[in-house]
Amino acid sequence: MAKKIEAYIKLQVPAGQANPSPPVGPALGQHGLNIMEFCKAFNAQTQEMEGGLPIPVVITVYSDRSFTFVTKTPPAPVLLLKAIGAKGGSGTPNTKKVGTVQRDQLEEIARTKWPDLNASDMDAAVRSIAGTARSMGIDVEGV
């Protein structure tokens, strides 16, 4: 018989840096999960990724207090800001621009995000990432 699912927990945890402090500890603790077991498993799975990059993770909690988790790709805005070397997006994206991104950079980000995007082809994925860039106040060239 399959295990009964109790809850889903969605977090963003820096790659390779999960520890029992907030937000991980309280989120897992309230469901009675072994926090250190998750931290060790998450850090082992994300050790080859760039350290400090926020990784979305969905933790499935079962009724016997066991769990499984699935990691996603880093958020597109984080990858875009890293590509242009900016600290944050623009508060007024239509008037104040924070940087410029080229099509090849967008393609690289789209390849990274491909497993989590619902685009039908790579060109659609690039256009989706370009839309995110424009909404952050980043000039897009070549799209």
From Swiss-Prot:
PTM comment: One or more lysine residues are methylated.
Gene label: rplK
GO-annotated cellular components: cytosolic large ribosomal subunit
Protein keywords: Methylation, Ribonucleoprotein, Ribosomal protein, RNA-binding, rRNA-binding
Annotated InterPro entries: Ribosomal_uL11 (IPR000911), Ribosomal_uL11_bac-typ (IPR006519), Ribosomal_uL11_C (IPR020783), Ribosomal_uL11_C_sf (IPR036769), Ribosomal_uL11_CS (IPR020785), Ribosomal_uL11_N (IPR020784), Ribosomal_uL11_N_sf (IPR036796)
GO BP of this protein: translation
Quaternary structure, from the entry: Part of the ribosomal stalk of the 50S ribosomal subunit. Interacts with L10 and the large rRNA to form the base of the stalk. L10 forms an elongated spine to which L12 dimers bind in a sequential fashion forming a multimeric L10(L12)X complex.
Family annotation (CDD domains): Ribosomal_L11 (cd00349)
GO molecular function: large ribosomal subunit rRNA binding; structural constituent of ribosome
Function according to Swiss-Prot or TrEMBL: Forms part of the ribosomal stalk which helps the ribosome interact with GTP-bound translation factors.
PANTHER family on file: 60S RIBOSOMAL PROTEIN L12, LARGE RIBOSOMAL SUBUNIT PROTEIN UL11M
Protein name per UniProt: Large ribosomal subunit protein uL11
Gene3D superfamilies found in the cross-reference section: Ribosomal protein L11, C-terminal domain, Ribosomal protein L11/L12, N-terminal domain
Annotated family: Belongs to the universal ribosomal protein uL11 family.
Keyword set includes tRNA processing: no
A Pfam family recorded for this sequence: Ribosomal_L11
